[in-house]
Amino acid sequence: MSVSANISVEAPIESQIQEIAYDGTEIYQLPPTLSEHLAKCAAKIDFSKTVNDLDLVKQSIKKEDEKKDDDSKDAAAHFQSSLWPWDSVRNKLKDAFTEVCVLSDVLAIAKEKRFMVLDPIPQEPPEVKQMVQVYARKKALASAANILLTGAERLKTAHTDQGGNRSAPDFHIELLRLRRNWRLKKVSNTIIGDLSYRTAGSKFMHPGMFEVTKAEDEDNNDENASAAAGTIATTGTAPEPKLTSLKVNVPTELQGVAFIKVITQKDQGDLCTATLNMMGSTQLFPQAGEWQKTLDFAQNVLFCKELFNQLAREAVQLQAPIPHVVVGNQIRATLLPGIQLVISLCHSTSSDSNNSSEPIKDHDHVLEHSLHQLLREFHHKNTHHPFPHPASAPLGPSKKRMLAGPSAFDRYELLEMTKSQTLLEQIIAQAQHIFTRRRAQYVLDTLAREVKDPQITSHWNAMNSPTMSCVKINITSHGYDANLRTSLVIHVKERSLKCICRDGRIMHMSYEMQELRDLILYQISQHQIVCLQSLAKCMAWQILSNSSHLGIGSVEPLGNASSCVLASPNSDRLIAVQVRCDPQLDVKVYIAQSPGKDFFPGSLVQGRHWEHLGGHFKELRFDKMEGKNFHNKMEFLMASLTSQT
């Protein structure tokens, strides 16, 4: 008998080759870990085969048991066949494996719901009748509408009963509306209001207080009856009186209607009028009662009194060449010689005065807006002071004045920074500018209407300052716009005019409009001469001489005439043109012929070449010549005098 030998079978140490690169490098596969090796071995076990083997073992065991029983009966009892020694261990492992499988299934079912899905058994859908649904919804909407209508009727009935029991609006509601627009405070048992502009920066000494009380029924009835009677007397109809539960008591000096009237007079005739008031503010609050109108009128009176008081104080303090006069409620200041500015405070306590409501024909809205704006700026300066820089600097100097040291301002610049205009000085300056501008407009319109040739057009700048306006004047000839267009710009200031011509010349004029008229007439004469020279060049005529100020002839009080002398292309014809502007434009045209027909040689002058000096000039009747305007006539004249040879 051969002796058995133990042979160990092990996996090769060398790993398997996973990939061979192009350069021959071999990439090996890493050896599996213990867990991977265990999983690989477990995957090779066939548990179903194991179960079948167990069944076969059980059947064989049963057969052996039966055979043993038979043998025990026949054979001796002291002998017993032995079973497989690991049978009990195997059975316990099998039971444990079964329990683990059951536990795994239970955990899988509990964790993943897909193992147990309850699918309901589909049933046939019931037949839906659409008309039944429509009737059901209609019935539900009808019941809801009935509930809402019933509630609305109840609210309407309650409101009607409440309105019938109360003749006037609630006092607290009216007080709330009053508090939205006016400052109120409670002093003891009294409600006091404030009409002044102190919160806006006003320093007027009048307190401007009013008292708010609760109106009694008898007072309401009396006021409504008187208001209705007055309305019937004026209009003939009886509107419904507006009831109120508030009563406003204003001081006596603030009752009524007040406005400031500014008039520019010349020889007791009004040139310009502006009225300052704040009426019409009650239209912004349609729900307000009679108290709103009363408070608006009272605040307007306070505003006008404050403005007039400030103007009167400045009129007394200013040192003008012609002193301002303050008499009663009237301030008189001199704008220009013979022209005065009258500022009046009109205050009427009677309710039937309609002077303020009458329309004014020559009302200047710009001046009215300026009066409002100037007082608002005065209030703004009282409350808004420039911040000091640095923080330790004194409060008061402006930022520009603080930079005077680092910027090295001189004495003149420092004096200019300290200058400021008062309200009255600004109003006087604006009134002077308005008067000067109107006179300039009148002069330009008059010249444009009187002078038909050439045409004068004025374009006023829409964006102007209150003390300076700008107008551009264009002088053109109809049909000859391409030859020449004379343009000049005039700056209208308070007491002077500044003219800037096209060639850059600047001329300063006073407020006398005769200087402006003379300047425009001079520009017209220059335009005619320069445009004629341009036309002569186009027609090949020669310009022999040109003079802007002709020094011969009669002396003119408003300036000398302009002239030019033209020669034909063959130099056989001469044209002399003279344009005068006193008192209106006057054009004279003279012609001469060369050689002269009246030349006769004598003993002293024997050469025939002396006849080309030209003959005497003859004046033409310019008004009888054919043509639409001056340049058209001159074009026809030069064309007819041009020789063909």
Swiss-Prot record:
Disulphide bridges, residue numbers: none
Places the protein is found: Nucleus
Pfam families, A to Z: Med17
GO molecular function: transcription coregulator activity
Principal subcellular localization: nucleus
GO CC, one annotated term: mediator complex
Domain of life: Eukaryota
Keywords in alphabetical order: Activator, Nucleus, Transcription, Transcription regulation
GO-annotated biological processes: regulation of transcription by RNA polymerase II
Quaternary context: Component of the Mediator complex.
Reported function: Component of the Mediator complex, a coactivator involved in the regulated transcription of nearly all RNA polymerase II-dependent genes. Mediator functions as a bridge to convey information from gene-specific regulatory proteins to the basal RNA polymerase II transcription machinery. Mediator is recruited to promoters by direct interactions with regulatory proteins and serves as a scaffold for the assembly of a functional preinitiation complex with RNA polymerase II and the general transcription factors.
Sequence similarity: Belongs to the Mediator complex subunit 17 family.
Protein name: Mediator of RNA polymerase II transcription subunit 17
Organism expressing this protein natively: Aedes aegypti (Yellowfever mosquito)
